């Protein structure tokens, strides 16, 4: 039973544009922008309601996950949160704007890691009138 690994052609990875963590271990130095990201992204644990700690994405961790799982297509979510707080960084780079951030991810992941396509999700509330979402969505 199961699926032959050779029959899987497209492996999709989905990441946030920033990292989050719920728990007791230390995660990052205190920075007001992380509180802004937490608030803008509604970063609370689904079961416990505990506040998620936020940090910049680590390209090392993303590359490791892509390599380990054979990802060849990637979706980057929560760009609207970084857009709201006007902060564009990774753990090792700072960008002037969203264009630079996207170009960096495309170069670092698309070109060097062999990712076929990288999709960047925009504001989830920006839908047309034929497909509205409720405020809770």
List each model region and its residues.
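Non-transmembrane, aqueous-exposed alpha-helical and coiled segments at domain scale
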Residues: 1-137
